[in-house]
């Protein structure tokens, strides 16, 4: 700790004004003394000899004249082996250990180390004495679950160093010295398996930043096919309350084709975090065959926890994600919900008496949101390997109003927009991603022409539906009515997905391509019916057959039989296919 001390001069909610003597810096951590407790706080503004601190605890009992001590360190997290499978709060306190120490009701001023000081890790050296290393270079390895965890030179060491000592292979604790390095001035530095890094400072220990192009497979048809996300990309899921944002994120976290998932639950209901904690240990990661919890880190600040630490939780989550990216891994960060984070910013901005922007959010809201999403990306490390951080954030606009500031600021910086619709969720069309309002800048797992052909039916079908509401079904031509039925068919059998069915909840890319080719045959078929009732009955029967087909295990006997039945049904009504659709299908097959 530094020798800088201060005393409380004013208290306003969870913001404390402190008069100090000495040197302090923005985002530095300080502790406010209240009786026997020390409340953690962060400097958010410095003016002359007075600083404003946001306290990460309830400030009940804090009074003018209380002592404040400053640490000289920025708000930071501990990085090292043992992060996977943990549940932290926004300040990286392990919540299960906190519960053991103080019970289920959190006490103020209790902080525990993020990484276990007693656990031992099998260390295998990667460098030899005499080699030169820089920050981010690998010193050795230790197994962490199914991953090969890299022990790296701390990111804050900006010089080039010579290795003068490296431990032999064996078991060590996280704070045992595993290497010593010498800088250009001849000073030696001891290195351990763990180090600290400020949460609001992006990690730049890489050779090159690349453009995200490789699709991130989520196993959700509507996302992978129509509104894809790339590894290292960004996307947002805005939607009204109860539209299915959290369920969609949970499905993504279970099935996404990534190595590590970081869930930052900032300001959401505690029940949703509890659901994750109950489900994930029992679920199997299809890539490794191990428990899903072994690849997951949860950073949760629920709505019942102090508001200030919500802001810290998203930064804590993205810093942990960047750490695993430096190991050449693909990481997915899910922030639920960024609206609560923005509300925490608004609350603190109001207490600082700053000039408010739209809806009382701070004027710098857009730059804060942009700086957060810019920490996503694909990078090429110095070793030549690639790592990525993909950020997906939910937005909870009041009343589902997408024109509010948080949604608009997010739309300017993300690469994909998965807008959830109240109309679709009320109709139980899940996932309730609106097929016309949503968009993506990333390449799909399917052929672009096939996707465009399907979207044309969704768009034209919606136009016909609007027309039918005015003139009725009788005033609609058979040609338009068939376009409407084909659009509804595509929606019901491909866009909608049953997240509670063991088969339909996760659809591999090979199956998506195979099934979409059959859907294309339906969309491109030239059909003739005597009446609209016959057309409706035909598509109703075909839709039910396809929904049963979706629930058959991929390449199983039931799957093959159901596909034969569907193809025979299609052949019975029409063998002629539109030339454009036929060309696309031939290219897909």
From Swiss-Prot:
It comes from Treponema pallidum (strain Nichols). Pfam families: ATP-synt_ab (PF00006), ATP-synt_ab_N (PF02874), ATP-synt_ab_Xtn (PF16886), ATP-synt_VA_C (PF22919). It catalyses: ATP + H2O + 4 H(+)(in) = ADP + phosphate + 5 H(+)(out). Belongs to the ATPase alpha/beta chains family. This is V-type ATP synthase alpha chain 1. Its EC number is 7.1.2.2. PROSITE patterns: ATPASE_ALPHA_BETA (PS00152). InterPro entries: ATP-synt_VA_C, ATP-synth_a_Xtn, ATPase_a/bsu_AS, ATPase_F1/V1/A1_a/bsu_N, ATPase_F1/V1/A1_a/bsu_nucl-bd, ATPase_F1/V1_b/a_C, P-loop_NTPase, V-ATPase_asu. ATP binds at residues 239-246. It is an enzyme of class 7 (translocase). GO terms for molecular function: ATP binding; proton-transporting ATP synthase activity, rotational mechanism; proton-transporting ATPase activity, rotational mechanism. The keyword Transmembrane helix does not apply. One of its GO terms (biological process) is proton motive force-driven plasma membrane ATP synthesis. Produces ATP from ADP in the presence of a proton gradient across the membrane. The V-type alpha chain is a catalytic subunit.
């Amino acid at each position: 700790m530094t020798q800088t001390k201060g005393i409380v001069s004013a208290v306003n909610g969870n913001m404390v004004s402190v008069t100090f003597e000495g040197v302090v810096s923005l985002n530095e951590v300080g502790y406010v003394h209240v009786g026997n407790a020390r409340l953690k706080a962060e400097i958010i503004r410095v003016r002359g000899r007075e600083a404003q601190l946001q306290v990460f605890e309830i400030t009940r009992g804090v009074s003018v004249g209380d002592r404040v001590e400053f640490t000289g360190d920025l708000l930071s997290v501990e990085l090292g082996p043992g992060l996977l499978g943990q549940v932290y709060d926004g300040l990286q306190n392990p919540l299960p250990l906190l519960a053991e120490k103080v019970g289920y009701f959190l006490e103020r001023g209790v902080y525990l180390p993020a990484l276990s000081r007693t656990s031992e890790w099998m260390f295998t050296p990667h460098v030899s004495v005499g080699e030169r290393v820089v920050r981010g270079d690998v010193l050795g390895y230790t197994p962490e679950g199914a991953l090969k965890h890299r022990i790296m030179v701390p990111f804050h060491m900006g010089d080039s160093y010579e290795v003068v000592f490296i431990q032999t292979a064996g078991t060590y604790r996280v704070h045992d010295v595993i290497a010593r390095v010498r800088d250009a001035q001849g000073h030696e530095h001891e290195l351990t398996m763990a180090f600290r890094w400020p949460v609001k400072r992006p990690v730049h220990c890489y050779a090159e930043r690349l453009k995200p192009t490789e699709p991130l497979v989520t196993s959700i048809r509507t996302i992978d096919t129509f509104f894809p996300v790339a590894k290292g990309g960004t996307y947002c899921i805005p939607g009204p309350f109860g539209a299915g944002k959290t369920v969609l994120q949970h499905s993504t976290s279970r099935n996404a084709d990534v190595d590590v998932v970081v869930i930052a639950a900032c300001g959401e209901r505690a029940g949703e975090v509890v659901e994750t904690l109950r489900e994930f240990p029992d679920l199997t990661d299809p890539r490794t065959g191990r428990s899903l919890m072994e690849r997951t880190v949860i950073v949760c600040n629920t709505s019942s926890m102090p508001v200030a630490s919500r802001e810290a939780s998203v930064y804590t989550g993205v810093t942990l994600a960047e750490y695993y990216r430096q190991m050449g891994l693909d990481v997915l960060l899910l922030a639920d919900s960024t609206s609560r984070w923005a509300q925490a910013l608004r609350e603190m901005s109001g207490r600082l008496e700053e000039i408010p922007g739209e809806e009382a959010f701070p004027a710098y809201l857009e730059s804060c949101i942009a700086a957060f999403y810019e920490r996503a990306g694909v990078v090429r490390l110095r070793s030549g390997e690639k790592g990525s951080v993909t950020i997906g954030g939910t937005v909870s606009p009041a009343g589902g109003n997408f024109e509010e500031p948080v949604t608009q600021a997010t739309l300017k910086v993300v690469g994909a927009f998965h807008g959830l619709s109240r109309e679709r969720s009320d109709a139980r069309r899940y996932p309730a991603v609106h097929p016309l309002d949503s968009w993506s800048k990333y390449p799909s797992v399917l052929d672009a022409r096939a996707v465009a052909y399907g979207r044309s039916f969704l768009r034209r079908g919606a136009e016909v539906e609007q027309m039918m509401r005015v003139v009725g079904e009788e005033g609609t031509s058979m040609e338009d009515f068939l376009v409407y039925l084909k659009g509804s068919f595509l929606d019901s059998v491909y866009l909608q997905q049953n997240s509670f069915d063991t088969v339909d909840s996760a659809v591999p890319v090979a199956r998506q391509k195979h099934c979409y080719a059959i859907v294309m045959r339906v969309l491109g078929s030239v059909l003739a019916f005597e009446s609209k009732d016959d057309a409706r009955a035909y598509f109703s029967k075909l839709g039910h057959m396809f929904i049963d087909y979706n629930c058959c295990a991929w390449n199983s006997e039931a799957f093959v039989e159901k596909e034969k039945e569907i193809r025979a049904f299609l052949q019975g009504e029409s063998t002629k296919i539109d030339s454009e659709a036929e060309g696309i299908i031939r290219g897909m097959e």
